[in-house]
Amino acid sequence: MSLSQESGAHHDPQDYPVVSDEEDEIDILGEDDSCSLKSHFYLQPTHSEMGDSGILSPSKLSCTESESDSSGESEGGTSKDSPATPSGGKAKRALVKPPYSYIALITMAILQSPHKKLTLSGICDFISSKFPYYKDKFPAWQNSIRHNLSLNDCFIKIPREPGNPGKGNYWTLDPASEDMFDNGSFLRRRKRFKRHQQEFFKDGLVMYNPLPYYRPYSTIQPQQVLQQTPVACMAIPENLTMPTHLAPYPDIKRKVPYPDQGVHRGFEALDADNHPNKSQSKCSFSIENIMRKPKEPEPSFSTFNPHWNYNHLLQRPNSCLLPAVLNLSTGPLLSNAQGTRQYNLIKFPGCY
């Protein structure tokens, strides 16, 4: 009893907060270390750890239970929450994104179709049914499929037939893009496919078949223009020739624009030499004037010098003539005192 009184005399209540400071430092070390230190310093539970009913406080119980839990986990090998972890892992593994690009997915969808063509909705349905990852995230990647169809040359748009009801155009693969993937594996593309426009639009013209100006994606050379378009030549009397396959149209009332003033004056001088009296030889080349004056010498294209017969310049009523184009690629057809020139009159469509 004397020992207890002495201990009570030497220890006043102000010394107890020191224990709380030690507990704070132990919490920094960790929960397991705090329990081991308490068991080392306190052989018996103190009054503060005992409740009013004489039961250990929850902090003490937690230390004892932690030891039993750790031993139980080591023996059983599994924790209480172990069944929930594998199920969550399986769910995550099922939603892993497939290792295929959008081009590969579109190619898979088109190749599995019976007619080797599908609409945008058909492609999306195939991808959703084949890969659960895209099924759960359907609205987000549909625009990516649409952009890949439009921006890649390996996909060709096919318009829907008039008698085939439905919405949207069909999409198919370019025949030249069959070797786009290595050994038929969709994991990697060999190279990006680019369509050659000259082969795709081969022998096709957008506008005006006689002229190659509107041929898409091709370089037009001057020699090709002269070879593919009908050309009428107009030259000085010594070297002027007329194409024989062009038929004259004497009943056309159309004025021909002369490209060069010197050539125009040459025609006027020739008319003055062949017809001194212009008032008598002037004619409008109409059927009425021919019927009214049957006895007068009628100037026609046959009476002129055959080298100066230029009625072939008017070939069709709905055609017109461009100004003469200077071309030095072929032989000289125009010659005068100063030099040699050649004029080609190229027919231009769509003029009225």
Swiss-Prot record:
Residues 97-191 bind DNA. Residues 1-32, 47-92 are annotated as: Disordered. The lineage of its organism: Eukaryota, Metazoa, Chordata, Craniata, Vertebrata. GO terms for cellular component: nucleus. Its main location: nucleus. Residues 20-32 have a biased composition (Acidic residues). It is found in: Nucleus. The keyword NADP does not apply. Expression begins in the newly forming dorsal mesoderm and is maintained during gastrulation at the dorsal blastopore lip (Spemann organizer). At the early neurula stages, expressed in a row of cells along the dorsal midline that are destined to become the fllor plate of the neural tube. At late neurula, expressed within the anterior and posterior poles of the embryo. After neural closure, expression is detected only in the tailtip, the otic vesicle and at the midbrain/hindbrain boundary. GO terms for biological process: negative regulation of DNA-templated transcription. SUPFAM superfamilies: Winged helix' DNA-binding domain (SSF46785). The keyword Repressor applies. CDD domains: FH_FOXD4-like (cd20048). It comes from Xenopus tropicalis (Western clawed frog). Coiled coil: none annotated. This is Forkhead box protein D5. Residues 73-82 have a biased composition (Low complexity). PROSITE patterns: FORK_HEAD_1 (PS00657), FORK_HEAD_2 (PS00658), FORK_HEAD_3 (PS50039). Transcriptional repressor. InterPro entries: Fork_head_dom (IPR001766), FOX_domain-containing (IPR050211), TF_fork_head_CS_1 (IPR018122), TF_fork_head_CS_2 (IPR030456), WH-like_DNA-bd_sf (IPR036388), WH_DNA-bd_sf (IPR036390). GO terms for molecular function: DNA-binding transcription factor activity; sequence-specific DNA binding.
